[in-house]
Amino acid sequence: MKKIQIHKVIFTIILYGIGFTMLTPLLWMISTSFKPENEVFQFPIRWIPEHSVGFDNYKEVWGEQYNFGMYYLNSIKVTVISTALQILVSALGAYGFTKIKWKGRDQLFLIYLATMMIPPQVMIVSRFVIMQKMGLYNTHMGIILMTMFSLYGLFLLRQAMMGIPDSLCESAKIDGAGHLRIFFQIVFPLIKPSIATLAVLKFVWTWNDYQTPLIFLSNRMLFTIQLGMKLFASESGSIYSLTMAAAVSATLPLILLFLCGQRYIIEGIASGAVKG
């Protein structure tokens, strides 16, 4: 019994050590955002600033000079719309692959699922050409259209819908309900946990996406927060206290989302390989 307890204690200490190591950069980032520039690289590190500047760094970052607020709003716009559309599209697709019987349904789904093995980088050139020909290059609509479809979202919601008895849908059909009514009034409410999982994961993926806006946006007025951070680091002249204040501002929505939805993130990761 004692050996088991000692083993658990050692294991717990190791986990806490790993967790603290992973949190150290985040804590340093938050601490640095409240420091004057001359205290940023002091050694040993002062986790609590000796001469705190309060929120002055944040006020400067969010001032009109750097347009940080515009990048923030652009990210919110793209992320929220893309997440909402992906939930709707994935849910409708999953319903079609589970509750509507048609020839070749399962075979087509396997082919569809097999495309997950294709790296997204392979399709960048073709996407670029398509966006240009459609007149959607350098627009938020183009970014949203490219990020609103997800094989993982379809797979996740299909697995959830497979757990819903077909008898519920059949009973609704007998009462005169059509597919849309069955979907929105019966199926959709029953898969809310999976929808929440997809919403949290999709929000994180889109908010952190750097590659897609980098390739398909050239107008600074349309830049998302990730491109804005890169531009800000160049314009601020490597003033690390300001850069860390900007980084904290960019990370804050994800931190809050993780604290509120960590259960759904864990469920999503446990349900299969995560791929955006």
What positions do the PLM features span?
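A structural signal for multi-pass alpha-helical bundles of membrane permease subunits
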Residues: 2-276
